[in-house]
Amino acid sequence: FLAAGLPLSWVAKQRKAFQAYLLQNREVEFSFRRKDYRIRIVGAAVYPQGFAAIAPIVNRFTGSNMLCDIGNGTMNTLRALDSNVDLRQMFTEKYGVQQCVLAIQEALMREHHAELEEQMIHNFLRYGTVGIDEELEKAMKLTASDYAKKVFRKLREHGYDPRIMKLYVVGGGGCLLKNFFPIAPDKIIINSDICATAKGYEYMADVQNVTGGAK
């Protein structure tokens, strides 16, 4: 059984089409870590990205909260008052980590005539350094910090107010914010578990009992 997801504001319109896509091949063969598998797909469910990561704990939310899911291609936001999710306050923007990667590549070429592989830039965003020339890393840090500031600008456009809200950040962009933006740990909670969303999909499928016992 497959439990997968789509960006928050795309789920309503694209769920059925994506579900059909996931089920187009019921018998699948593949290799993973030098082991061969043959599986039979018995069903599929599609859930909102980002929300899946907080689904197991949302019933413990109190006060005003905002979820920010920063993936590779999109940034999704969702508001919740106590444990009640407000579906009217759900937004998706094409402002994921890849936009930051492209901005860094452009800055390095423009300012230093240097090219850097995308994987090294992703590692820099994740760890804060990749051990290259100091001036290059300085330019990368400035660009990443500017991207992080723009993320919070977009959050404010969607109603984020750090004076009254807690912010929950999930997705790969969480490490970026942690490394390149001053985070108040009592107001901004970053979930750095890269499997959090996948675990959330499994949790929601189990809660809704849609798997029929399939694992």
Describe these PLM feature segments.
Residues 1-65, 84-99, 119-215:
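Nucleotide/phosphate-binding catalytic cleft detector across ATP-hydrolyzing
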Residues 75-79:
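Short beta-strand scaffold segments in enzyme catalytic cores
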Residues 68-72:
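Active-site-proximal alpha-helical scaffolds that flank and shape metal-associated catalytic sites
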Residues 112-116:
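Short, basic interhelical loop/turn and adjoining N-cap
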